Amino acid sequence: MSPNIRDICALFLPLNGVYPNCATFRLEVAGLAEGRPSVLVGDFILVKRRDASTEWYKGCVHEVSADTVNLRFSSNFSTYKGKKFDVRFVLNRLPLRRMHQALTLKTDATRFLFPELEHVRMGRVNTEQLSSITPINRLIGEDYEQLMTVAAIVHQPPGSVPFIIFGPSVHVYFYSVVSVIHDVNCRPGTGKTITVVEAIRQLLARDPKVSILACAPSNSAADLIAQRLRVLGPSQLFRLNAASREYKTLPEILRDFTLFNGNLVFATPSIERLKKYRVVVATCVSGGIPHGLGVRQGHFSHIFIDEAGQCMEPDAMISIKTMADKWTNIVLAGDSKQLGPSVRSHVASALGLNKSYLTRLMAREVYDLRTATGTTYLSIALLQTLRKF
């Protein structure tokens, strides 16, 4: 049985008066701190008395601590001290539902799902384009390769093929169609995320119409992007959090960039308010929230996905399929050589779900250095010093 779906025998401790018109109880759960089972705010837990009763009651989790969860039931649920219950932890299907929603959306997705040479709209960065970039981060200005990468992203025409930044955390590999791969030894602090942040700030500075959705597989990775963009201020930057996230896990310096209610539960702004932000940062799963609010496809001129090598392709598609139109540019940053997506199903893994979107794209001919020809510029900057592949 999945570690997230199991039955246990448990005792409830009543929490009288916490919520009016609700039966509120505290449930002790062994292994909660280790994520076995994984329980988040907003999850549902089913309980049934251990006697002859066959009726299951549904409780909603409204607080999670190291070894207990607080549950709210309807007012018709009651118990007394010492009464034993069977407890069933139910898998939270919201991420799966958002993946299915994204995959079933009808859209002209050939350009970013199965890009071909005919979809490429840009040649190599020229001297004029490169000189037009005034680095905001001095580390970028001191690194020619990183600067060239930023220039390439900034000057991509709308509707280009996905732009890929790839390599391990201490190196960035630059990819262009000259039958070579360029290995750049980066200075500390000039990795992929720094390059992504610089590109975002350059895009914002050059065009007031630019609107960006920046995603990452985990809250920690998304928080890192938001922290490095906080110079934009709360009027331009919004850190979009799922209601299931614990408030205490958000870095304090980002609290002015998000929205939460009086119970310290993260909330979602109105569509009008969300559309006013120039940069929205979220996890890949929460990247589907704007679509749920009614934000139209194409509202975001650019979609960035950092650590794209670690998320399943359906995760990446949540933001791309719901928010991209034929003019939206997509930028992926990640390392196809590192550990890929975590897939529990052996069947799904064998059928390819353990291969990230970034990895699959890089295997296509349009990104293949050995078969691509001519001067077509595909993914990242051409370096002055070439190293034979």
Listing of model-derived features with the role each one plays in the protein:
Residues 266-298, 315:
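Conserved helicase/translocase P-loop NTPase motor core
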Residues 158-165, 179-184, 209-210, 278:
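Pre-Walker A (Motif I) flank of P-loop NTPase domains
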Residues 164-169, 188, 195-230, 238-240, ...:
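Conserved RecA-like ASCE P-loop NTPase motor core of nucleic-acid helicases/translocases
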Residues 2-16, 170-188, 381-384:
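Short, compositionally biased segments
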Residues 154-155, 174-180, 193-207, 228-229, ...:
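Walker A/P-loop NTP-binding motif
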Residues 19-23, 30-157, 227-230, 239-261, ...:
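Pre-ATPase regulatory/linker segments immediately N-terminal to the P-loop/RecA-like helicase/translocase core
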Residues 169, 188, 281-283, 306:
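Hydrophobic beta-strand scaffold positions of dinucleotide-using enzymes
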Residues 207, 218, 232, 285-287, ...:
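Conserved helicase motor core of SF1/SF2 NTP-dependent helicases
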